[in-house]
């Protein structure tokens, strides 16, 4: 009987091999995947230089910042009397210190080119930190191009020199150190960012939960919170010592009036509704409600107790909410991905229900959206599509009803998607799928 002939296995078509190779690199399954972040970083550095060279600088707030610093250097300590061309000083004291340094470095603000170069460096440092956070959270490499492609984000940093750039850097540095379980450094950096701009208050509930669950000790958590409060006091001492009420009312003003002509997010509701007190209260109520849903059903899950069970021992018996073994078990579930998902989702919830977003607020959106859309479980094509639509909406000037509806819509999809799609990140018993996914990527 003749032996069956053995045919050599044919190789897959060349296009199939190329596609498999590209998918392996994009999903982190190839050694070349590690080259994607540094390659994109270098390209973006060149792009920043090209923008400074070719695109005219846009004056918005820089001159006002310099005028305000000049008044403070002249001895003014009453925040209600410090004004610039675009209005009063409404930022905490860390903003003043940073722009005082820039005031001296840039010849009292006159050397705009040097200021742009400094902000380009600030952008690159922030981008490096963001990439480090993404890598630590095991985000797939195909997300990284989205970190470098935003026209609006480059404009915020390199062409407009907003103080949001520093606040965003401190926020990402805090996430970076939290992921490495350096709670003291992370808490310090976060509160410094809050000292630049109070927009970082949006992520404060999540930061508090991350510190509580991750530090492994209720006492340590209280110490960290006390340190953050003390830093805020020390930052404001030159102003608190003379005009405390004026400083607090301006630097952390929560009742500020917003102009309909500048809104990026709520133009589609019309000016009458936008300016109404009922609309403001509705947004506040929705913000609190959705935050409560995330806290009770997602963020505190590593504690393996309900919110009532956590609070009751503290209020009724003065005892820590978790025993030492319980706290250690919870801390093990506070992974780099949990930290990033929790803090960025809190930020997204706050931005979704914000009374009014201006164009510079995209600095808090641009680098978080790709990660959150991925955590929502969306297909990469949908991630790129939603990112592109959102980017378009933030580049429409002035905003239109259509563009503002897109801004709110994508934020809504992001928040809802994370709540539904990333639930395993907060469920102690559902992490096996995440670990398998990470193993497949690396």
UniProtKB/Swiss-Prot annotation:
Metabolic or biological pathway, per its Swiss-Prot or TrEMBL entry = Protein modification; protein glycosylation
- Chief subcellular location: endoplasmic reticulum
**Transmembrane regions:** 35-55, 85-105, 112-132, 156-176, 199-219, 221-241, 273-293, 334-354, 377-397, 402-422
Q: Does the keyword Transmembrane apply?
A: yes
Q: Which residues lie on this side of the membrane: Lumenal?
A: 1-34, 106-111, 177-198, 242-272, 355-376, 423-442
- The segments annotated as topological domain Cytoplasmic are 56-84, 133-155, 220, 294-333, 398-401
The protein's location, in the record's own words, is: Endoplasmic reticulum membrane
* Annotated GO MF terms: dol-P-Man:Man(5)GlcNAc(2)-PP-Dol alpha-1,3-mannosyltransferase activity
Q: Which UniProt keywords apply?
A: Endoplasmic reticulum, Glycosyltransferase, Membrane, Transferase, Transmembrane, Transmembrane helix
A single GO BP term for this record reads:
protein glycosylation
Q: How does it sit in the membrane?
A: Multi-pass membrane protein
Which reaction equation describes what this protein catalyses? an alpha-D-Man-(1->2)-alpha-D-Man-(1->2)-alpha-D-Man-(1->3)-[alpha-D-Man-(1->6)]-beta-D-Man-(1->4)-beta-D-GlcNAc-(1->4)-alpha-D-GlcNAc-diphospho-di-trans,poly-cis-dolichol + a di-trans,poly-cis-dolichyl beta-D-mannosyl phosphate = an alpha-D-Man-(1->2)-alpha-D-Man-(1->2)-alpha-D-Man-(1->3)-[alpha-D-Man-(1->3)-alpha-D-Man-(1->6)]-beta-D-Man-(1->4)-beta-D-GlcNAc-(1->4)-alpha-D-GlcNAc-diphospho-di-trans,poly-cis-dolichol + a di-trans,poly-cis-dolichyl phosphate + H(+)
What EC number is given for this enzyme? 2.4.1.258
Spell out the InterPro entries in the cross-references.
Answer: Glycosyltransferase_ALG3 (IPR007873)
Keyword Hydrolase attached? no
- What family is this? Belongs to the glycosyltransferase ALG3 family.
Q: What is this protein called?
A: Dol-P-Man:Man(5)GlcNAc(2)-PP-Dol alpha-1,3-mannosyltransferase
Q: Which gene encodes it?
A: alg-3
